[in-house]
Amino acid sequence: MAKAAKAPASFETALAQLEDIIQAMDSGDMPLETALASYKQGTELIKFCQGKLADAEQQLKILENNELKTLDLPNGQ
């Protein structure tokens, strides 16, 4: 029986885990079952990250009176 995956602590943690999965899968040395499990975990991490980004966008809309404005960063960052 498959165990439920624990949600990442943060967006940054999820992104780092996703990068690790991509790097491991790109190596081509992963057995099929491991690759399938990694793919599933990767899709769950992507959904988590998309949710966090959507939440952040919603917070920005609220802060800007429902008008999404361009964020000007100093020094072209």
Curated annotation (Swiss-Prot):
Keyword NAD attributed: no
Documented EC number(s): 3.1.11.6
Major localization class: cytoplasm
Cellular compartment(s): Cytoplasm
InterPro entries xrefs: Exonuc_VII_S, Exonuc_VII_ssu_sf
Reaction(s) this enzyme catalyzes, per UniProt: Exonucleolytic cleavage in either 5'- to 3'- or 3'- to 5'-direction to yield nucleoside 5'-phosphates
Nuclease among keywords: yes
Superkingdom of the organism of origin: Bacteria
Gene3D superfamilies: Exonuclease VII, small subunit
Keywords, sorted A to Z: Cytoplasm, Exonuclease, Hydrolase, Nuclease
Single biological process term from Gene Ontology: DNA catabolic process
GO CC aspect terms: cytosol; exodeoxyribonuclease VII complex
UniProt cross-references to Pfam families, sorted A to Z: Exonuc_VII_S
One Gene Ontology molecular-function label: exodeoxyribonuclease VII activity
The protein's assembly and partners: Heterooligomer composed of large and small subunits.
Family the UniProt entry places it in: Belongs to the XseB family.
Role noted for this protein: Bidirectionally degrades single-stranded DNA into large acid-insoluble oligonucleotides, which are then degraded further into small acid-soluble oligonucleotides.
Protein name, UniProt field: Exodeoxyribonuclease 7 small subunit
